[in-house]
């Protein structure tokens, strides 16, 4: 996985703020994700899917390939984005706590 853990952590924090009806957090999250390159967005979505249980960590390449075909809205409109990203980080051996610090 190439995306920086701290970048995923920033997405997690903003997604949690967005759930609390923060229009500013939503705008910042959309801007952050839109500024990512295609590979980072695909990795973020693949990570969400691993955390949600759609793919196993061992299926990372398949998840990444599928994520590359999905629009940005698939990530931003997903329920429980923060929880799934946090779980995905743990499943691929990265620390979500370190990402949020």
Per-region residue spans from a language model:
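Short terminal alpha-helical segments
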Residues: 1-23
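Polar alpha-helical coiled-coil and adjacent low-complexity
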Residues: 17, 24-28, 34, 81, ...
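Generic amphipathic alpha-helical segments used as scaffolds and interaction surfaces in large
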Residues: 32, 50-54, 72, 76
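Structural motif
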Residues: 32-42, 76-80
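Short, hydrophobic/amphipathic alpha-helical patches that form generic packing surfaces
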Residues: 41-52
């Amino acid at each position: 996985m190439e995306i920086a853990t701290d970048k995923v952590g920033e997405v997690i924090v903003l997604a949690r703020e967005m759930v609390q009806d923060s229009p500013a957090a939503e705008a910042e999250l959309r801007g952050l994700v839109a500024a990512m390159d295609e590979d980072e967005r695909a990795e973020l979505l693949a990570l969400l899917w691993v955390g949600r249980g759609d793919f196993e960590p061992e299926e990372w390449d398949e998840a990444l390939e599928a994520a590359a075909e999905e629009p940005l809205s698939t990530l931003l409109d997903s329920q429980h984005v923060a929880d799934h990203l946090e779980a995905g980080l743990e499943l691929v051996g990265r620390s979500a706590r370190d990402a949020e610090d």
